[in-house]
Amino acid sequence: MKKVLYVAAIAAALAVGGGVYLSSGATAAPASTFVLLDGSKKSTEDLKGQVTLVNFWATSCVTCVAEMPQIAATHEKYKSRGYNTLAVAMSYDPPSYVVNFAETRKLPFSVAIDNTGAVAQAWGDVKLTPTTYLVNKRGEIVKRYVGEPDFAELHRLIEKLLAQA
């Protein structure tokens, strides 16, 4: 009897895991307004027509700081093909720290500050950093990473999305 329960538990876990994998289709990126460091604004609607990496991060997050050179390199590699990056600093990150980080690292992409936390809330109540979303040309989230992405896998997915009409 224990063996049957054990096998049933494994089968159920695989079914649930497979279901999560299969049902992880693209969902529309939430309507948001991003306030960039220069004071200009960008909306979720502005992301359509290009593949965009939306990275929630903080200057106090060791992993965020460590992955930023790879995020910048990914941006540089694909930007001429319709790829964009938007780094969204968390509400608890002092704006002066974010500006200093972006300027001293010469980040080659847009950086926004989520002063109120509304953007993080809209994107699935992001609390852990880094949390990164890959958005396709139709404005749909196709992948979510919590923690540093596997950049080889991310590049393969970007290539695939850039090839789509």
Language-model regions, residue ranges each:
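N-terminal targeting signals for export/organelle localization
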Residues: 1-35, 165
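Short, ordered coil/turn segments that flank beta-strands lining enzyme active or ligand-binding pockets
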Residues: 37, 47, 137
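Short active-site neighborhood of thiol/selenol oxidoreductases, capturing the structured segment around
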Residues: 43-62
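Active-site acidic short loop of glycosyltransferases
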Residues: 48-49, 80, 108
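Alpha/beta-hydrolase fold active-site loops
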Residues: 51-52, 83, 130
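Hydrophobic beta-strand core positions in alpha/beta domains
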Residues: 53-55, 87-89, 133-134
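Structural microenvironment flanking redox-active thiols in thiol-disulfide oxidoreductases
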Residues: 65-105, 115-121
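Thiol/disulfide oxidoreductase modules built on the thioredoxin-like
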Residues: 100-108, 115-160
